[in-house]
């Protein structure tokens, strides 16, 4: 019995994109909340904690729901495709709202950003558990430990890929030049690249 490495890597692409997304979320969203929308650390911290609160309910619910789902494309893929599609659309709205707020601040835009961010977290929650459960579905039980190692490796690759992208787009010298000129960092290219990774994955 031999592990199908190619299939396991393909399955792991979803986890790669999830890890790349969360790296961006944890690093960039707090900066947007505090620097663009001028929220204090308490409010931004509460917003950033929302993903953990939602995960308590969404992950077991959609994991269980996918267990009971049967379609032509399998148990997990409907959730992965739907969640990824919604997440791609919603995450690209965030920098648009941020840029619009920077040009003309308003409370409505702040509220819109928070609402879209919440919907994005829900979208991510719909397919996180199904994506993780996909590997055991297609891997014989004796080989699942090896399969899990590959999945975790793919997640690490997603994190490394994100760091490589940010080191190119937002190098320290470039950030210092923007700050010296009194400008603002535009994160839209980063959101677009991460969403492209999610689309391809």
Stretch-by-stretch model annotation:
Residues 35, 63, 68, 99-100, ...:
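Transmembrane alpha-helix termini and helix-breaking/packing motifs in multi-pass membrane transporters
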Residues 41-45, 110, 141-151:
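Loop-to-transmembrane helix entry/capping segments in MFS-fold secondary transporters
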Residues 81-82, 111-114, 184-201:
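Symmetry-related core transmembrane helices of the 12-TM Major Facilitator Superfamily/SLC fold
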Residues 1-54:
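Helix-loop boundary and gating motifs at the non-cytosolic
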Residues 126, 136-144:
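Paired intracellular helix-loop junctions of major facilitator superfamily
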Residues 16, 83, 87-130:
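Hydrophobic core of transmembrane alpha-helices in multi-pass small-molecule transporters
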Residues 50-56, 87, 145-174, 197-198:
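Glycine-rich segments within core transmembrane alpha-helices of 12-TM secondary carriers
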Residues 44-69, 82-91, 157-163:
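Central cavity-lining transmembrane alpha-helices of secondary-active solute carriers
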């Amino acid at each position: 019995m031999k592990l199908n490495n190619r299939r396991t890597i393909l399955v792991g692409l979803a986890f790669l994109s999830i890890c790349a997304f969360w790296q961006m979320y944890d690093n960039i969203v707090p900066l947007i909340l505090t620097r663009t929308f001028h929220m204090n650390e308490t409010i931004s911290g509460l917003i950033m904690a929302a993903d953990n609160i939602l995960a308590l309910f969404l992950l077991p619910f959609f994991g269980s729901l996918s267990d009971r789902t049967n379609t032509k494309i399998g148990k997990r893929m409907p959730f992965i495709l739907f969640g990824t599609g919604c997440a791609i659309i919603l995450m690209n709205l965030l920098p648009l709202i941020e840029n619009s707020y920077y040009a003309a601040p308003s409370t409505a835009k702040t509220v819109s950003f928070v609402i879209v961010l919440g919907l994005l977290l829900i979208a991510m929650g719909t397919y996180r558990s199904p994506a993780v459960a996909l590997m055991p579905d297609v891997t014989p039980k004796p080989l699942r430990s090896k399969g899990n190692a590959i999945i975790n490796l793919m997640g690490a690759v997603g994190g490394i890929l994100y760091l490589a992208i940010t080191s190119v787009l937002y190098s320290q010298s470039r950030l210092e030049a923007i700050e010296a000129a009194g400008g603002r960092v535009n994160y839209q290219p980063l959101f677009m690249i991460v969403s492209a990774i999610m689309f391809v994955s």
